[in-house]
């Protein structure tokens, strides 16, 4: 994969640790000059769910276990990965979402996955969950995400892909305080490894 899986692991690890260690809350406290330690929680209580268990998703699932997180994956068919709870198909999407504190989307774009990050599905996540999308911009219904953030159902979102790209300057995602954005840079092809693989 030309080093893309390692980059993707780094990307998701950075942001998942950001939320797990309550860095977003500390950032909110700082301008208010609040000295408040957030309660400790074990890593095993942080339930990560990966939408899309292809090559990148499977490698991410294995990598995240090193932090002690409770990792599950959802895909079209059951996957067998040590230490990862597997969900598959439309009937198991709701139970997968309802147990997920941090949803990581790495799905391919198909007619079945178009708009999968919508109000109905994201609303099945527990209150205070976070959504991270590095799949495709078309997976996300942006207005639904913004509404769930404003209603405080979702704690935050990390977005690397958008529809369209680049995102228009007047889009509501840009300045939302609970949204962190990157310009489709979660994983980039490394020229040398790709050339070596082809040659």
Task: Give the location of each predicted region.
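NAD(P)-binding Rossmann-fold cofactor-contacting core
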Residues: 66-83
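Gly/Ala-rich phosphate-binding loop of Rossmann-like dinucleotide-binding domains
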Residues: 61, 65, 149-150
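Phosphate/diphosphate ligand-binding glycine-rich loop within oxidoreductases
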Residues: 1-27
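Glycine-rich NAD(P)-binding loop of Rossmann-like domains
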Residues: 26-59, 86
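Short beta->alpha connector loops at strand-helix junctions that form conserved
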Residues: 1-3, 135, 184
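Adenosine-phosphate binding glycine-rich loop
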Residues: 167-168, 175-199
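Rossmann-fold NAD(P)-dependent oxidoreductase module
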Residues: 11, 15, 59, 63, ...
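Rossmann-like adenosine-cofactor binding region
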Residues: 78-172
